Amino acid sequence: MKRFDVVALGELLIDFTQNGLSGQGNMMMEANPGGAPCNVLAMLQKLGKKTAFVGKVGDDFLGKMLAGVVADAGINTDNLKFDRDVHTTLAFVHTYEDGDRDFSFYRNPGADILLSADEVDESIIKDARLFHFGSLSLTYEVSRAATQKAVAAAKEAGCIVTFDPNLREPLWKTLDEAHDQIDWGMRQCDVLKISDNEIQWFTGREDFDEGIKILQDTYNIPLILLSMGRDGSRAYYGDVVAEAKPFIQENTIETTGAGDTFCACVLNYVLDNGLEDLDTDKLTEMLVFANAAASIITTRKGALKVMPERSEVEKLIAERQ
C-alpha cells in the first residue's frame, strides 16, 4: 500500500492581495500563502487524502512561514527545500470588480524555479497513487529538469499523472515556449484540467468542444476537465460529455484558488472511483461537487489556509438542489 494518495510538485509562494486602504490612503496588501500545487493538496487534505509536496522556498521569513502553513495543513514537507541565496517567490494579485485577477510576479529568479533534479526525492513520488504538476515549474530550465525527473518517476511507478497548465503569461520568455512546454505536459498526463481561456489560446479555437476534440485526438488523454468560471464546467471522457452549472455566490471576493479547489475535488473523485467506466451521471456528480467547492473559495481571501470542509460543500449542494 502506498504511503501517499497525492504528491504534487511546483510553486509555493506568497499571494499578496489587496485588503483596503490605510489611514493615509495607501493600498494595504495581505500576505496569503499560495501556489497552485499546494492549494490542490490543501483541499485534498480536507477531503481526507494523504498528500506530500515537492518544491523550494527561500530560507527567509516568508519561506519559513510557508513551510509552517503547509505542514499545519497536514501536507508532508519532507521534500520541501530551502534556498539560502534566493528569496521566496512573490505574486501581487490585482482583483477587478468582477472577481477576475491580474498578476505581477517577483520571480527573477525566485526560489521555486531553482528546485533541481538532484533535489527531487523519487521515493516520495513513487510512493503516491497520483502525481500532480502544473506549468509554472516548466518556465525555467532548472525546475523544468526537476519536473521531468518527477514525472518520469511517477510514470515508472504506475501513478496516475495529472496536469493543470495554469498559464501565467508574464512568467514565460515567449508564448511559443509556453505552448511547447504545455504540449509536453499534456503528453504525460492521464487527467487534464484546463480553463476556458487556456483551451482557446492553446488550440486557437473559440468553440470549446472543437478545442477539446483537438486535444483528445492529439494527446489521447482519458479525462479532460474544462473550467469555465461563471459558466460552470465540463468533463470529457472519450465520447462522454458532462456539464454542470456553477454555484454563483453573491458575496464573491476574488477567484484566487477556485480552479485549484475544483481540480482537487476532481482528483479526489478519480482516486475514489478510478478512471474506468465513467458515465455521464458519475461525471456530473464529480463536477457538481467540484463547482460547489470552488464557489465557496471565491467568498474567502486566499486559498491554501481557507479550503472548505466536505460538510460545507455538501450543505451548499443540498441548499441549491
Locate predicted features.
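Glycine-rich phosphate/pyrophosphate-binding beta-alpha loops
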Residues: 89, 135-139, 294, 300-303
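Short, electropositive alpha-helical surface patch
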Residues: 62-75, 180-188, 212-216, 248
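Conserved phosphate-binding/catalytic region of the ribokinase-like
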Residues: 1-5, 152, 208-321
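Conserved beta-alpha-beta core of the PfkB/ribokinase-like small-molecule kinase fold
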Residues: 139-214, 221, 231-232
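Glycine-rich phosphate/adenosyl-contacting loop at the front of the ribokinase-like
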Residues: 1-76, 115
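Conserved N-terminal subdomain of the carbohydrate kinase-like
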Residues: 50-133, 314-321
